[in-house]
C-alpha cells in the first residue's frame, strides 16, 4: 500500500518485450503494463482558484498529436520554456491557430459562447475536455468546436485549460496581457462548479 491520500495514478501499456524492432506484427507479444502513483494536490489546487499565466510557443510536435504516446519531448520543452519565462504553462501554436496546452486542452469564452478547438490530428482529445463539453450542453451553456486563432485568444473574455489532473484551470494572463479583468471569470467558476 502506498498511503496515497490525494494524487494521480498513471497507467502505461506497451506493445510488450521483444528485440528492438519497429515490426508490430508479432502476435506472440504480451503487452507490458506500468502503473505508478504520484502525490499531487488536485482537489484544492491553489491555481484553480487564482488562475495561471501562460505564453504561446510554436507547436513542434509530430503530425499525429491525437495519439497518446510517451514521446513528450516537445511538450516538455514547451513547459520548461514557460517556467523559464516566469509563467506557469504554454499553449502550442501552429499556423496562427492554438492547438492545445503542453499537457491540456484549451477553451476560451468570447462573444457569449465557449470555444475549443475541434478534434483533429492536431490535438489529443482529453477526458476532461469531453466531460466539459457534455456538461456545457446539459446546462445550456453555448459551446462550439472550431479553430481558435491568436486574435481570438488575446481578445477572449475568459480562457481556461482542462486536464485529468488539473480539471478546469483558469488562465488570467496570456503573453503578458491580462485576460478579461485579470481575475478568474464567472464562466470558469460556473464550469468548475459543474465539473
Put a short name on every predicted segment.
Residues 1, 14, 19-195:
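Helix-start/capping segments and mature chain N-termini
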Residues 4-12:
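Ordered, amphipathic secondary-structure segments that act as subunit-interaction surfaces
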Amino acid at each position: 500500500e502506498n498511503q496515497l491520500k490525494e494524487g494521480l495514478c498513471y497507467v502505461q501499456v506497451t506493445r510488450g518485450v521483444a528485440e528492438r524492432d519497429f515490426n508490430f506484427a508479432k502476435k506472440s507479444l504480451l503487452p507490458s503494463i506500468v502503473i505508478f502513483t504520484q502525490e499531487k494536490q488536485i482537489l484544492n489546487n491553489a491555481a484553480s482558484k487564482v488562475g495561471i499565466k501562460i505564453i504561446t510557443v510554436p507547436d513542434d510536435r509530430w503530425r499525429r498529436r491525437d495519439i497518446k504516446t510517451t514521446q513528450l519531448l516537445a511538450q516538455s520543452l514547451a513547459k520548461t520554456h514557460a517556467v523559464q519565462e516566469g509563467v506557469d504553462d504554454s499553449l502550442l501554436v501552429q499556423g496562427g491557430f492554438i492547438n492545445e496546452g503542453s499537457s491540456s486542452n484549451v477553451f476560451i469564452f468570447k462573444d457569449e459562447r465557449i470555444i475549443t478547438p475541434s478534434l483533429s490530428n492536431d490535438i489529443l482529445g482529453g477526458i476532461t475536455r469531453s466531460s466539459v463539453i457534455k456538461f456545457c450542453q446539459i446546462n445550456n451553456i453555448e459551446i462550439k468546436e472550431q479553430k481558435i486563432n491568436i486574435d481570438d485568444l488575446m481578445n477572449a473574455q475568459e480562457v481556461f485549460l482542462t486536464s485529468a489532473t488539473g480539471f478546469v484551470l483558469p488562465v488570467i494572463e496570456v503573453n503578458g496581457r491580462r485576460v478579461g479583468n485579470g481575475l478568474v471569470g464567472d464562466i470558469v467558476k460556473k464550469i468548475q462548479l459543474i465539473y
